[in-house]
């Protein structure tokens, strides 16, 4: 029985298709290996961060015990980070505090942002103090905010941080590949804090459970809600998150 030869053009086409399929399979294999390696890097970093946080916490506890044992006082390190949330309205705001609220991207009620605490930012926040509540967020508060209400600015769009790939695509050039990298950069106020802060969309919080205090617009130390509440910001954020 005679063998039917395929036309040369068909043979060439089949060879090209086979070559393309082989190249795709090879590329897929490389991608799979790269993704596996990346997952390992992300996992190892998260474990290292947890170890770092735990050791820092133990160090503070030990320092406090040592201070107590020697009959002296433990002085907390100067805070480097604040979380600022706008709690007062739109109307009749003088130009200076209005400008500060715009600079902080607090253009809506219950919007919140992380701010690196410096002399300059402290003075800015002071100008806006009658309209905001702020304080020193804990690691737990930062993590809860980012995981529950974290959105990034991608091509001027508000995109949920539902995948590490979104973070890597926008912050990978700063070696920030995952949501835990992002949280670590905020909590430690790392070298790329500004880039991370600018990438994060202002957090949209809710009115606190049970509402604000009756004297909401007085300073916190006077029984109101505005101004610096130091560590007590964590309780407010928990109510609003």
UniProtKB/Swiss-Prot annotation:
What is the name of this protein? Answer: Large ribosomal subunit protein uL30
Cite the record's Basic and acidic residues compositional bias ranges: 9-26
Subcellular localization(s) per the UniProt record: Cytoplasm
Please list the GO terms describing molecular function: RNA binding; structural constituent of ribosome
Organism, by scientific name, is Candida albicans (strain SC5314 / ATCC MYA-2876) (Yeast)
Major localization class: cytoplasm
Biological processes annotated in GO: maturation of LSU-rRNA from tricistronic rRNA transcript (SSU-rRNA, 5.8S rRNA, LSU-rRNA)
**What domain of life does the UniProt record list for this protein's source?**
Eukaryota
Pfam families documented for this protein: Ribosomal_L30, Ribosomal_L30_N
* Family designation: Belongs to the universal ribosomal protein uL30 family.
**Record gene name:** RPL7A
What does the record give as the function of this protein? Component of the ribosome, a large ribonucleoprotein complex responsible for the synthesis of proteins in the cell. The small ribosomal subunit (SSU) binds messenger RNAs (mRNAs) and translates the encoded message by selecting cognate aminoacyl-transfer RNA (tRNA) molecules. The large subunit (LSU) contains the ribosomal catalytic site termed the peptidyl transferase center (PTC), which catalyzes the formation of peptide bonds, thereby polymerizing the amino acids delivered by tRNAs into a polypeptide chain.
Q: Where is this region: Disordered?
A: 1-32
GO CC, alphabetical: cell surface; cytosolic large ribosomal subunit
What assembly does the database describe for this protein? Component of the large ribosomal subunit. Mature ribosomes consist of a small (40S) and a large (60S) subunit. The 40S subunit contains about 32 different proteins and 1 molecule of RNA (18S). The 60S subunit contains 45 different proteins and 3 molecules of RNA (25S, 5.8S and 5S).
**UniProt keyword list:** Cytoplasm, Ribonucleoprotein, Ribosomal protein
